[in-house]
């Protein structure tokens, strides 16, 4: 599994420079192929460096035997300012929902302190999820959008951010 997959599974894993994960690895090397392998994944500087059936010598092994390990997920459509009320009022039609929840909430992001706090929860939870890359919608407020980008970078997450 060499490639640009981020080796972010748990907080303790993210901060280590070189380590090996032991477990059951699931990936799709081709669109019609699901591959399941037992073994070891060597991770160096946050990137997957190679897969082996044996543990590399001299490298700490994090044992996740019985756990499924997958490459990070990519979210292609994510609205960061809507995070605080996701799942709210699911019975409303879209336009009603936008008018009652989205537009009033996004107006608060004109306040830099509000944006900083709101995005901190979003980024924290995104980092602790299986999502390692994303296309994220912010608000029309430039300073708030820059704050989101700053927080994503600080968390080590890769994203395209727009409004």
Regions found by a protein language model. Name each.
Residues 9-56, 67:
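N-terminal metal-binding scaffold of metallo-dependent hydrolase/deaminase domains
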Residues 74-76, 134-136, 159-163:
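Hydrophobic faces of well-ordered beta-strands that scaffold small-molecule active sites
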Residues 87-157:
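Alpha-helical scaffold segments that flank or form the walls of functional sites
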Residues 31-36, 45, 54, 64, ...:
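Domain-wide signal for the mature, well-folded portions of proteins, strongly enriched
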Residues 26, 79, 139:
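Catalytic metal-binding/acid-base residues of hydrolase active sites
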